[in-house]
């Protein structure tokens, strides 16, 4: 299987479970000079990203206008905007930028899609997204936010034009299945509301030895990589796992890095810390989602189609008509009581 780090997955696909049946995103930041950014009202230090949906065919002016409107609606108040590259050609100031964008798409995608000239490129839908001046400060605490947003748009348009590019159709060949391992997930994630770092996976996942030695557990939590991994197929996570911490000193340091005192750690996990003192071999594993694997094998589009007693969107089991009211006697037997919220 292909192997890709979490950071590469986000920077290239905008998601931690890439669907590699479609080409990756392209970063056009180096093509936009400060002068061009100023003229186009684009933030100076934020990435400009583009992607291509293959074999959509040439769109009419009306169709393209409607598509740009749909893209802007999807982006909402994010501060991101669609750059209409077709209008750049008519301006002597921006025509070189349009040519640079076209050439970079050609360079990045020619081997993937099999076209070798800009004329063939016209059959493919090109989308370029720019951060407008004053893009929300959310960027300040999530440096990957723009990549994730553009990645979500990429998938949305891929679904919209699925009947055109046909990349999601089953051909009965090995090419239908794009497996990969995504590795090196973040050890911590930032909670903006609580202003604290939390364990992204769980606090028993082992961090990279290099990050431990560099002191990043206390000095730079956002850069700490976990020995965590997912196996992905066609944009679906089939399983997730990690290498566990097997050293007491590392486990204690992780608890401290999450704001837990040594006393609290021993009160809650003393049994585990004591066990680690006697020596534990390196160990890890993975949990596979059997229901998702069955869904793919069955060619189903939803987990509900392969689960024996699926729930509705309102969490109702239509087979047994659950949930149903519980009698007072049943509640009493279980020492439970119901509380009605105002």
Language-model regions, residue ranges each:
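Class II aminoacyl-tRNA synthetase catalytic cores and aaRS-like
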Residues: 1-342
């Amino acid at each position: 299987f292909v192997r890709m780090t979490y950071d590469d997955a986000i920077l290239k696909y905008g998601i931690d479970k890439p669907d590699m049946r479609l080409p990756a995103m392209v970063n056009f930041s180096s093509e936009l000079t400060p002068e061009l950014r100023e003229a186009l009202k684009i933030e100076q230090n934020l990435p400009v990203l583009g992607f291509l949906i293959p074999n959509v065919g040439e769109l009419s002016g009306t169709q393209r206008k409607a598509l740009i409107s749909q893209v802007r609606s999807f982006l909402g108040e994010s501060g991101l905007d669609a750059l209409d590259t077709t209008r750049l050609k008519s301006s002597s100031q921006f025509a070189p930028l349009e040519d640079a964008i076209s050439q970079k798409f050609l360079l990045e995608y020619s081997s993937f899609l099999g076209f070798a000239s800009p004329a063939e490129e016209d059959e493919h839908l090109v989308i370029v997204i720019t951060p407008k001046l004053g893009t929300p400060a959310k960027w300040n605490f999530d440096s990957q936010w723009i990549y994730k947003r553009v990645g979500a748009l990429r998938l949305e348009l891929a679904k919209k034009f699925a009947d055109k590019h046909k990349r999601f159709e089953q051909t009965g060949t090995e090419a239908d299945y794009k497996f990969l391992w995504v590795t090196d997930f973040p050890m911590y994630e930032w909670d903006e509301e609580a202003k604290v770092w939390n364990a992204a996976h769980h606090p028993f996942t082992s961090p990279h030895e290099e990050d431990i030695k560099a002191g990043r557990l206390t000095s730079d939590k956002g850069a700490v990589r976990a020995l965590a991994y997912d196996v992905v197929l066609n944009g679906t996570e089939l399983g997730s796992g990690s290498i566990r911490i097997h050293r007491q000193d590392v486990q204690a340091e992780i608890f401290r890095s999450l704001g837990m005192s040594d006393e609290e750690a021993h009160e809650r996990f003393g049994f585990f810390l004591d066990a680690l003192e006697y020596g534990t071999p390196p160990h890890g594993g993975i949990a596979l989602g059997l229901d998702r694997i069955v869904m793919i094998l069955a060619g189903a589009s939803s987990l509900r189609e392969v689960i024996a007693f699926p729930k509705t969107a309102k969490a109702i089991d239509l087979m047994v008509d659950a949930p149903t009211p519980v009698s007072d006697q049943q509640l009493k037997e279980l020492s439970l009581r119901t509380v009605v919220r105002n």
